[in-house]
Amino acid sequence: MSTTTLTRREQRAKAQHFIDTLEGTAFPNSKRIYVTGSQHDIRVPMREIQLSPTLIGGSKDNPQFEENEAVPVYDTSGPYGDPEVAINVQQGLAKLRQPWIDARNDSEELDDRSSAYTRERLADDGLDDLRFTGLLTPKRAKAGKRVTQLHYARQGIVTPEMEFIAIRENMGRERIRSEVLRHQHPGMNFGARLPENITPEFVRDEVAAGRAIIPANINHPESEPMIIGRNFLVKVNANIGNSAVTSSIEEEVEKLVWSTRWGADTVMDLSTGRYIHETREWILRNSPVPIGTVPIYQALEKVNGIAEDLTWEAFRDTLLEQAEQGVDYFTIHAGVLLRYVPMTAKRLTGIVSRGGSIMAKWCLSHHKENFLFEHFREICEICSAYDVSLSLGDGLRPGSIQDANDEAQFSELHTLGELTNIAWEYDVQVMIEGPGHVPMHMIQRNMTEELESCHEAPFYTLGPLTTDIAPGYDHFTSGIGAAMIGWFGCAMLCYVTPKEHLGLPNKEDVKQGLITYKIAAHAADLAKGHPGAQIRDNAMSKARFEFRWEDQFNLALDPFTARAYHDETLPQESGKVAHFCSMCGPKFCSMKISQEVRDYAAAQAIEVGMADMSENFRAKGGEIYLKREEA
């Protein structure tokens, strides 16, 4: 762990340098490939890990090798993972989905911004130096139209986004021919419907049923389509965002790019400091993944941080502002009802959700029902006009394992199920947020309750943390719970970093959180039996058994750390071709011994086989040619 502490000025300068020198970068011995769809502009990016050949015999002077197939893997890095793409953060990413959005002819450009706050910010010349220069002219659904992926799916339409996703979810496994790599254990999927091959029609049907969502605001055309659902790969979200005391626009853009490099499927901008609007614009215009927000945070800023002063009008203006910038999903704490707040009084840790506590305080101050609940249909009308998905927030989630699975938590969950049905009336896509802090033996109930109460809408959880005793290691305590609930059916896992409960994460913390959660998500995919999930594991195991060290590094989720740990003990280049590692040494390496045993067994089998044939030959009289009936 680094002990170097940078000043705020140094941190900003470092982030600015990162942005200024940013270019498409591939992982070691990987290359970007594109798998095309039925139309020319559906080009699905993947990373292909190139592997070295296996030594199968021959002599020292004339060795014989067998080629190993390249392994394609899911890639969230967008253009940042393609060395052939010129990156310019000042201009933003190419608008990948714009032709698809325009071709549907159900949306129109706005003459002016719908949000009074946005108009005010745009009129402020003092913000020119902070503002993203290539502002997008926002679009909205035409009168009487709905532009959501759920609406299209219910009409039986397979959109380009759906075809893109089908190709992406199959992870290029059709390219793999090796039976060794294709071998996979059957999973235990707890009632999930995992097909052998994911088709565009399957994607459409899952979205139409509400079991999956495609977060894809029509004002975020830069995003690459992805899906969140129980019957697809488990996804991982990363949180970034500035605060009133730390972090800048440059640092948040850097964290965005960094997050997508290390596997974030979506990113939530939880900014609460100054320049929230400007920071979000920079993030959206440079994000290849969906962006989520918690609009109540910004609405609170607009009333100077006083929860009691929040109004529906201020919140509505914030929704319009963010929808027209391109936010793909909103976390809305509409299930924190006035009558549920007293249920938290006897909790050890009360209400730990920031959004939940804001709404609880507002309800108690005014002794009125949550205005997000009261105006929920209006929220849905806004979302359906831009295709903003709803992430129904768990404002009453447990903040300690003592409070897990209590009355307040599940009462709110049942209300979220009722709100899900309302959102679906407006063709608005919905996922449900979950805990939190839950011991291992109580995790599965969270999944079963959610499936039943919320009609199989996708579940999105923060961990859960399985113990409360490990500040500084909560990425690990929560990774355990994340792997379990992902196996049980959770669709997306919100990462936890080592700084959880302690401070705002920096770049290294973001990486640590993401790697931990990519492990959890992948472990869940293996346990569920997602088609093709085991290919990379098989390739790694084969490389490990054959002492192909470079391939082991390159197949790892974090090749750089794997290489660094190996080189701490065996830094010489010869260590990367050695048939042992530093753990056991050359004489006690189990895999080297296993290879020797295998070779010996094969030789013995040949020798025994020859002896058997010799005995049989003598038993037949030693004649070279036998009569037909004796043969």
Swiss-Prot record:
The keyword ATP-binding does not apply. It comes from the Bacteria. Its EC number is 4.1.99.17. [4Fe-4S] cluster binds at residues 581, 584, 589. Keywords: 4Fe-4S, Iron, Iron-sulfur, Lyase, Metal-binding, S-adenosyl-L-methionine, Thiamine biosynthesis, Zinc. It catalyses: 5-amino-1-(5-phospho-beta-D-ribosyl)imidazole + S-adenosyl-L-methionine = 4-amino-2-methyl-5-(phosphooxymethyl)pyrimidine + CO + 5'-deoxyadenosine + formate + L-methionine + 3 H(+). Binds 1 [4Fe-4S] cluster per subunit. The cluster is coordinated with 3 cysteines and an exchangeable S-adenosyl-L-methionine. One of its GO terms (biological process) is thiamine diphosphate biosynthetic process. Zn(2+) binds at residues 437, 501. The keyword DNA-binding does not apply. Pathway: Cofactor biosynthesis; thiamine diphosphate biosynthesis. One of its GO terms (cellular component) is cytosol. InterPro entries: ThiC, ThiC-associated_dom, ThiC/Bza_core_dom, ThiC/BzaA/B. Gene3D superfamilies: 6.10.250.620, Radical SAM ThiC family, central domain. Belongs to the ThiC family. Homodimer. Catalyzes the synthesis of the hydroxymethylpyrimidine phosphate (HMP-P) moiety of thiamine from aminoimidazole ribotide (AIR) in a radical S-adenosyl-L-methionine (SAM)-dependent reaction. PANTHER family: PHOSPHOMETHYLPYRIMIDINE SYNTHASE, CHLOROPLASTIC, THIAMINE BIOSYNTHESIS PROTEIN THIC. This is Phosphomethylpyrimidine synthase.
